UniProtKB/Swiss-Prot annotation:
This is Aquaporin PIP1-3. The modification N-acetylmethionine is found at residue 1. It comes from Arabidopsis thaliana (Mouse-ear cress). The Asn-Pro-Ala (NPA) motifs may contribute to the formation of two hemipores that could generate a narrow channel. GO terms for cellular component: extracellular region; plasma membrane. The chain crosses the membrane at residues 55-75, 82-102, 133-153, 175-195, 209-229, 257-277. One of its GO terms (molecular function) is water channel activity. Gene3D superfamilies: Glycerol uptake facilitator protein. The gene is PIP1-3.
Length: 286
């Protein structure tokens, strides 16, 4: 059904303006759907920008693990929760670092910092398989190095305080942990798609420079909800880096959850955004 023009208030403008609503607001006049990324693009391998983007993902994930693992260890080291930043502080550390790092790297690599985000964007044909695999490898290497530097600086506390490794908490089943990871990653990747949607930035409803803010805030909220269940993975590189450096049996017992869950959540978010949210037809005018 075609939308009609109605009086609406746009932004902070106190004067009513005549604006089309519904599908009439979404013509090719203000937006053109970009072509999907090629499935495989070997030409990228000869481009410096390709490797620069991978280095940016490595450094960002390195810094992410370094700061967040130290924060988790600081909370566990405290004699009681009141003597530390607590769960809220951990959530702020994760969300704040994602906000800062996405802001710093978005213009270079897209600011993924998470294999699940990369996987979701790949399914939506936002990047090629070549770039997706390279990003995931660099993210995992960065996470391993970040956790490794923390252990290098504080070897004994790192081992005794758990090294920031993700495990399913006592009292929760594997299914509960898997569900928490699926839903948590869905929230994150859905937010990434919404915050970076070119269709929105083509109109006045979106300010692209603010995209890191909702992404970081989504990470913060998911951590508040799921830290008591799994310690919050929603990022396979983060879980892998901490598990490899910590290297205790219980850190590997349920490690599959922190890959399967985020990848399922990312796939569901990509499908939902592409098939439901973006499934509004664009009317072409001759």
């Amino acid at each position: 059904m075609e939308g009609k023009e109605e009086d609406v208030r746009v932004g902070a403008n106190k004067f009513p303006e005549r604006q089309p609503i519904g599908t009439s607001a979404q013509t090719d006049k203000d937006y053109k759907e970009p072509p999907p990324a090629p499935f495989f693009e070997p030409g990228e391998l000869s481009s410096w920008s390709f490797y620069r983007a991978g280095i940016a993902e490595f450094i960002a994930t390195f810094l992410f693990l370094y700061i967040t693992v130290l924060t988790v260890m600081g909370v566990k080291r405290a004699p009681n929760m009141c003597a530390s930043v607590g769960i809220q502080g951990i959530a702020w550390a994760f969300g704040g670092m994602i906000f800062a790092l996405v802001y710093c790297t978005a213009g270079i690599s897209g600011g993924h910092i998470n294999p699940a985000v990369t996987f979701g964007l790949f399914l939506a044909r936002k990047l090629s398989l070549t770039r997706a695999v390279f990003y995931i490898v660099m993210q995992c290497l960065g996470a391993i190095c970040g956790a490794g530097v923390v252990k290098g600086f504080q070897p004994n506390p790192y081992q005794t305080l758990g090294g920031g490794a993700n495990t399913v908490a006592h009292g929760y089943t594997k299914g509960s942990g898997l569900g928490a990871e699926i839903i948590g990653t869905f929230v994150l990747v859905y937010t990434v798609f919404s915050a970076t949607d070119a269709k929105r930035s083509a109109r006045d409803s979106h300010v692209p420079i603010l995209a890191p803010l909702p992404i970081g805030f989504a990470v913060f909220l998911v951590h508040l909800a799921t830290i008591p269940i799994t310690g919050t993975g929603i990022n396979p590189a983060r879980s892998l880096g901490a598990a490899i450096i910590y290297n205790k049996d219980h850190a590997w017992d349920d490690h599959w959850i922190f890959w399967v869950g985020p990848f399922i959540g990312a796939a569901l978010a990509a499908l939902y955004h592409q098939l439901v949210i973006r499934a509004i037809p664009f009317k072409s005018r001759s």
